[in-house]
């Protein structure tokens, strides 16, 4: 598996490749105005490549990128019921800050709550650099 920055004109995006196939994507989008210190993390992993640690690795790399960009607070949206994704982000130190009721509509027309998670990047970067986090990565 190889991870590479997409292009010089999109420095806040990272992809994961397997045999020249894009199997994961993460982006850090900068906030504007009063929220210019906030970055939004977006993460997608191909269904057949989930549960392999790709999402966690991409999220960790996005945190490092956010820190380098000067982002203070990083937020991510998770659809309620995506328990594994929610658990992954909480293990990285994110906390739920809000819930938007019936905010997401599926292709089948069902509505779901949207959970808003956040973490201050400097705290998260310190936890990722800890010996305990390194031991988790070896598992």
Could you describe each region identified by the protein language model?
Residues 12-13, 22-26, 63, 69, ...:
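Central antiparallel beta-sheet cores of small beta-barrel/beta-sandwich binding domains
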Residues 39, 102-139:
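C-terminal "cap" of GNAT-fold acetyltransferases
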């Amino acid at each position: 598996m190889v991870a590479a920055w997409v292009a010089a004109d999109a420095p806040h995006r990272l992809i994961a490749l397997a045999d020249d196939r894009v199997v994961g994507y993460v982006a850090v989008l900068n906030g504007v105005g009063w929220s210019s210190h906030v970055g939004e993390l977006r993460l997608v992993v191909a269904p057949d490549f989930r549960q392999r640690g790709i999402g966690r690795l991409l999220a960790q790399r996005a945190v490092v990128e956010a820190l380098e960009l000067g982002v203070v607070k990083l937020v991510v949206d998770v659809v309620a019921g995506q328990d594994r994704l929610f658990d992954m982000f909480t293990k990285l130190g994110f906390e739920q800050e809000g819930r938007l009721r019936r905010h997401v509509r599926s292709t089948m027309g069902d509505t779901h709550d949207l959970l808003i998670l956040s973490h201050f990047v400097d705290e998260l970067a310190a936890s990722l650099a800890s010996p305990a986090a390194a031991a988790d990565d070896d598992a």
